[in-house]
Amino acid sequence: MSAKEEKVIRPIVHFPPSVWADQFLIFDDEQAEQANVEQVVNELREDVRKDIVSSLDVQAEHTNLLKLIDAIQRLGIAYYFEGEIEQALQHIYDTYGDDWKGRSPSLWFRIFRQQGFYVSCDIFKNYKEEDGSFKESLTNDVEGLLELYEATYLGVQGEGILDDALVFTRTCLDKLAKDLVHSNPTLSTHIQEALQQPLHKRLTRLEALRYIPTYEQLSSHNESLLKLAKLGFNLLQSLHRKELSEVSRWWKGLDIPNNLPYARDRMVECYFWALGVYFEPKYSRARIFLAKVISLATVLDDTYDAYGIYEELKIFTEAIQRWSITCIDTLPEYMKLLYKGVLNIYKEMEEIMGKEGKAHHLSYAKESMKEFIRSYMMEAKWANEGYVPTAEEHMSVAFVSSGYSMLATTCFVGMGDIVTDEAFEWALTKPPIVKASCAIARLMDDIHSQKEEKERIHVASSVESYMKQYDVTEEHVHKVFHKKIEDAWKDITRESPVCKDIPMPLMTRVINLARVMDVLYKHKDGFTNVGQELKDHIKSLLVHPIPI
């Protein structure tokens, strides 16, 4: 480093080191054993498939069929039965439309809404008395209360009956959880977990871990389904560990902790992030690419926020816009590794996709990365000038700098034939569902990261912008933002059935991005300061298999 560089005052911050070291670098392949397990899995899949198909034409079995589908989804094995589930739900929808005749209307409503069917909430009018209050009989049905509570999170703007039902069920369930602490601690815990995080916001693999032991305790459980859930979980965990080993070797080659020590070393957490977006085996290459992009996006974030000086950032931004290795000589020494790392992962994926005639898909991902970097540069400009943007100015840029519009486009790369050029173009236009996911990411991040970022030269957060513009307290802003976050979730539900030209598996990736935020940033910035909860999640998903 030159004497000139040494005099530069950098907005440096010391982030906690990685808690994982090289734990995931080595992967022990057990192919022979896995082949035997896969044979058993295929037999179990056929058993469950028959259960689904046999119930289709028997209307009296349709409620039980919905309960079976719900169990399959919560056990994390719906990817084994995508076609069968789609066929079953379409058949039931064609049979009843909005006029559901079976039991468990709350379950019917939730499953169809989360699958992208727009069914009416008028079915819940039967739950109310003439004076508008909810029927007293509902308070005695714990399972029914839980089902109704979970259904309310699939509401959209203007559905007042669901807003009322949420208040009603939360009040009842909160009381029940306290009353049952001693008499039925298992049920009390189950209720508390639901109140803490509704099903609609949970990550599938984490819900599978939580639900498998619960399902096993049900006297009515399907033995084939239970065994399939356990074996399937462990099989998939083995694939995920193999992928993480590959990403770990790539990260080790960059040696970020030594070469760029100012940046967060969160590669394992970034893989967890990508795993939250898609865990299914067929998305393996997409998941590996996304994990690498998120890992480097974290370093880019820290370069702009916590280390780079304004003139350096201008040069780096221009280099990313040009996207050419010939730009590398214009960069400061420490930025060269980062720039080369970014270009290399896109080039590598371009070569992989080129074998299928889809190399051009990377051009969409590059465009979203360029826009992402431009948003960082705008925030760096504001920070350099000491400018506090209005809340509206801030959000127009912060939606992009959250990284979620970039990730919403990038996560489609490598997903297979389901992704078309039109799907990428749709994502790049930032449709309402992408904007909603971005809003959730930005607002949750700002609520919990603001205090740490104030301690260094950093653009005013959306919290500070709102406080200054409207002359209100931080506590008031947090309430406003939490309401905006809930509204964004409603926008996601509203948009799922609207985007008919975009396949549901692609929409699900955008929704899953929002779900990851609800895990990582619900109570604090659990990504920067990795706590015990996230460590436990990662260990349970990537270290410890489920006992069979």
From Swiss-Prot:
Mg(2+) 3 binds at D445, S449, E453. One of its GO terms (biological process) is sesquiterpene biosynthetic process. InterPro entries: Isoprenoid_synthase_dom_sf, Terpene_cyclase-like_1_C, Terpene_cyclase_plant_C1, Terpene_synth_N, Terpene_synth_N_sf, Terpene_synthase-like, Terpene_synthase_metal-bd, Terpenoid_cyclase/PrenylTrfase. Its EC number is 4.2.3.57. Pathway: Secondary metabolite biosynthesis; terpenoid biosynthesis. A motif (DDXXD motif) lies at residues 301-305. Its cofactor is Mg(2+). Higher levels in leaves than in flowers and stems. CDD domains: Terpene_cyclase_plant_C1. It holds the Pfam family Terpene_synth_C. It comes from the Eukaryota. Mg(2+) 2 binds at D301, D305. Mg(2+) 1 binds at D301, D305. Binds 3 Mg(2+) ions per subunit. GO terms for molecular function: (-)-E-beta-caryophyllene synthase activity; magnesium ion binding. The Asp-Asp-Xaa-Xaa-Asp/Glu (DDXXD/E) motif is important for the catalytic activity, presumably through binding to Mg(2+). Monomer. Sesquiterpene synthase involved in the biosynthesis of beta-caryophyllene, a sesquiterpene with anti-inflammatory and anti-carcinogenic activities. Belongs to the terpene synthase family. This is E-beta-caryophyllene synthase. It comes from Tanacetum parthenium. The lineage of its organism: Eukaryota, Viridiplantae, Streptophyta, Embryophyta, Tracheophyta.
